[in-house]
Amino acid sequence: MGSGIAQVFASCSYCVKVYDISENIFNISRKRILTSLQKLKSKDPVKEMPDRISDRISYYTDMNELADCDIFIESAFENFAIKEEIFHKLSGILKPTSFVASNTSSYSITALSQLIPYPERFIGFHFMNPPPIMELIEVIKGLYTHEKTFSFFWKL
């Protein structure tokens, strides 16, 4: 799902940083994104060239590379321990002004928001699958989600 989310944002002209612990995942992600973009391009010749879109996506195995991000969207497997580890590491590097979202469909947004120092900047941002095709995203507030956070994601 993370590849599709990265593709959606890159297609909207955002520079995207993808983090994973495995370099092998990146090869799969690159291939999946390029294939998807080529299919979309064949259906709509007016669309931007796939290479230009995929060039906006960078891949990192060092989470410190995300320190300058304004938005972080977690899309790990639905395993609370994995999500907890990601948010714990993320808490030490992101700016206090960064927004944090989870693509979860299983866990409480309020519970996940407690894993970062700024729960008011945390939200659920659940993409339907596949993200590049399904133009539907659930925006889910937690108990501590600030209205500015909700408004920001609603307008994305």
Q: Where does each model-flagged region fall?
A:
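Buried hydrophobic positions in well-ordered alpha/beta secondary-structure cores of metabolic enzymes
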Residues: 1, 57, 72-75, 101, ...
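A structural alpha-helix within SAM-dependent methyltransferase catalytic domains
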Residues: 7-10, 67, 91, 113, ...
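Rossmann-fold dinucleotide-binding core
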Residues: 102-156
